[in-house]
């Protein structure tokens, strides 16, 4: 008798998904997917169903350089919150600080660790201060892959166009240009450091096509890409202890200005000893990550517990303007069951390998690889307006992501090998994702925008 990790209340819907699977797999093998939407349809769907396009859940900023701008309520609350300490009380301690260094890096994820390595290679003494442990960051939770246009039939030009299109032509084109030109160099640098990307039998990179892309350019390490990258970066940073000092459990609570008005360091708070520390630095780099744990609009999130928008607050209190924070990125497939995993990322790689979003009646309702904002809006529409979602025992709603299609398309064992992390995570709850689909709903994923920079 077949066992299932899903409760009895979901079995009828599961049976409908199973009964329609063979036909859907045949269509997928012939590349016959649910039709893709046009750009005009994108805008219509987003305006109706995407959380960022709804007027509720926003307030106007009352202070600072962005005064009058409407932003998410949760973000407004931390930007306008009362400071924990008065920096003026600590300014004199810059003359006799607890620590002094060339470069202070606030944040210990992938960006902070990379900045520390680059600074140390340029003869700088570095202090890396992190809120939790070194490596406790969103980087370590990234799964599906990292993009770079490095195949013969691809180019940074196409990567640029895909990125601009995915951003609905509102991107900062200079930053996008930097991203797409640097990406192949960064992939090579990571590989040289020791990151083990998935490879083809001939030794070339195994690259997949993600949502909104016209070419295959997603480099992965099974479905644990961020974990693999962070493993190598963390190891490399810790092997340079002569130049990089790590202060764990020491979040920054304020930045400090020196007598010239330039940033001269920061106030840290040691969570273990409950004391404030002053770090004097010739340069300060903010690498604090996003704001997912603010749970904008009440959504679950893929983000780690330290992702509370600290860098935005630190910079805004010094008068640095905010840019492009109007929209957040929601990942279309966050776990909606079991309850212990709510919001957990279900990597895009699942859909890249062939799994399709399916409603409660076992029907396709959208192309599996639309841009993330569009895919999220389509899933919300299916659940909220069309009432075609699956209701969990706790009252949550979601759609099926039919992962068993992957083994039927690519051969038995593909799910367990290519999605090793997800396979084990769901196995703990009695769900074999090679045989049963996952229940998903959009989850807060990336912070778009941030503090304004000079270039």
What are the functions of these language-model segments?
Residues 1-103:
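Extreme N-terminal leader/targeting segments of oxidoreductases
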Residues 2-19, 320-444:
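An anion/pyrophosphate-binding glycine-rich loop and adjacent beta-alpha core
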Residues 53-74, 78-79, 191-275, 280, ...:
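Conserved redox-cofactor binding core of oxidoreductases
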Residues 101-128:
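N-terminal Rossmann-like FAD-binding beta1-loop-alpha1 element of flavoenzymes
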Residues 109-111, 133, 224, 291, ...:
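Residue-level detector of alpha-helix initiation sites
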Residues 120-146, 152:
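Glycine-rich FAD pyrophosphate-binding loop
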Residues 148-179:
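Glycine-rich active-site loop/strand segments that organize a redox cofactor
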Residues 283-340, 344:
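Glycine-rich loop(s) and the adjacent beta-strand/alpha-helix scaffold that form part
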């Amino acid at each position: 008798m077949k066992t299932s990790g899903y409760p009895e209340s979901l079995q009828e819907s599961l049976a409908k998904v199973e009964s329609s699977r063979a036909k859907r797999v045949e269509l997928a093998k012939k590349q016959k997917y649910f039709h893709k939407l046009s750009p005009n349809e994108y805008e219509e769907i987003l305006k109706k169903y995407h959380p960022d396009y709804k007027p509720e859940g926003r307030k106007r900023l009352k202070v600072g350089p962005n005064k009058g701008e409407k932003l998410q309520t949760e973000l407004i609350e931390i930007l306008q919150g009362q400071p924990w300490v008065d920096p003026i009380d600590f300014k004199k301690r810059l003359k006799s600080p607890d620590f002094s260094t060339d470069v202070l890096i606030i944040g210990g994820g992938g960006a902070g660790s990379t900045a520390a390595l680059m600074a140390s290679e340029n003869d700088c003494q570095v202090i890396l201060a992190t809120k939790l442990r070194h490596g406790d960051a969103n980087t370590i939770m990234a799964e599906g892959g990292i993009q770079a246009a490095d195949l013969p039939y691809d180019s940074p030009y196409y990567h640029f166009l895909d990125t601009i299109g995915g951003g609905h032509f509102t991107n900062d084109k200079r930053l996008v240009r930097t991203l797409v030109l640097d990406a192949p160099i960064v992939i090579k640098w990571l590989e040289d450091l020791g990151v083990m990307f998935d490879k083809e039998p001939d030794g070339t990179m195994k690259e997949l096509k993600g949502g909104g892309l016209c070419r295959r350019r997603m480099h992965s390490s099974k479905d644990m890409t961020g974990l693999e990258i962070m493993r190598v970066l963390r190891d490399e940073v810790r092997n340079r202890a002569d130049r990089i000092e790590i202060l764990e459990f020491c979040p920054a609570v304020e930045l400090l200005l020196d007598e010239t008005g330039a940033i001269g360091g920061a106030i840290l708070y040691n969570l273990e000893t409950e004391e404030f520390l002053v770090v004097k630095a010739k340069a300060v780099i903010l690498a604090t990550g996003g704001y997912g744990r603010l749970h904008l609009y009440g959504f679950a999130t893929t983000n780690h517990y330290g992702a509370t928008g600290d860098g935005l607050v630190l910079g805004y209190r010094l008068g640095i303007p905010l840019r492009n924070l109007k929209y957040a990125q929601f990942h279309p497939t966050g776990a909606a069951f079991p309850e212990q995993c709510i919001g957990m990322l279900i990597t895009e790689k699942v859909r890249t390998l062939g799994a399709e979003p399916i409603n409660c009646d076992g029907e396709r309702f959208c192309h599996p690889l639309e841009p993330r904002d569009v895919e999220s809006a389509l899933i919300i529409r299916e659940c909220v307006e069309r009432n075609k979602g699956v209701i969990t025992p706790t009252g949550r709603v979601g759609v099926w992501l039919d992962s068993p299609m992957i083994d039927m398309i690519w051969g038995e064992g593909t799910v367990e090998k290519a999605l090793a992390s997800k396979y084990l995570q769901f196995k703990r709850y009695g769900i074999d994702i090679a045989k049963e689909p996952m229940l998903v709903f959009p989850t807060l994923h990336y912070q778009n925008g941030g503090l304004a920079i000079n270039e």
